[in-house]
C-alpha cells in the first residue's frame, strides 16, 4: 500500500512539471494574473488530474534510480513545457511590444505601469492591448486550444522522451521569433505611419512659424491620431481572432 501511494505521488510530481513550466511563460497562468501563487498552483494541479492515470501506467518509478537518471526526465519535461508556453505567449508579448512602441513614439514612456499579466513594467497601450487580447483569447477558445496541445504532447512526447535539438528545431525557434516581431510591427504599423506623418507636418509647421512651439501640441495630437487609428483598424487587426471565435461557437 505504501509503495503504491509512493508511486502515485511520484506520478503526480512528474505530471505537475510540464504544466508548471508552461505557466512560467504563459501570461494567463502566472500568479499575477490569477491573484496568488497558491491559486495558480491549485489551477495547475487540476490540469494534471486528466493525465495522472496515463503517467501512472507508464511506471515512472522505473526511470528513477540511484544514478540520478531522474534529472534527465525532469529536464525534458521542463523543456517541453517551456516550448509550449513560449509558443502560446508570443501573441501577448507581441501586443505588449506594439503598445510600448506606440507610447515611445508619442512620447508617453514616463507613464509606465505594472502589468500583472506579464509581471513586468509596461506602457499604457501595452496594458490595454494585453487585457484586450486576454478577452479575445478566452472567448475564441484559446485556452481550450492550449490545453489540447498540452495533453496531446503527452501522446507524442511522453515522460522520459525529450525534443531533438537539430537544425529543424532551431529553424522553428527562429520562425517563432520572426512571428513575434511581425505581429508587433503589423499590429502597430497604421498608428506608426500616422504619427510619422504628424511629425512631418509639425516639422513643416515649425519651419514656417518658428515662434510657435509645436512640441507642445505634439503629444496630444499624436495621442488623438493613435486612438482614432486604433478604433478604425481594430476590427481588421483582430479579424483572425473573430473568425476563429465564430468557428468555435
Task: Kindly give the residue locations of the regions a language model identified.
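Hydrophobic alpha-helical segments and their helix-loop boundaries in membrane
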Residues: 1-249
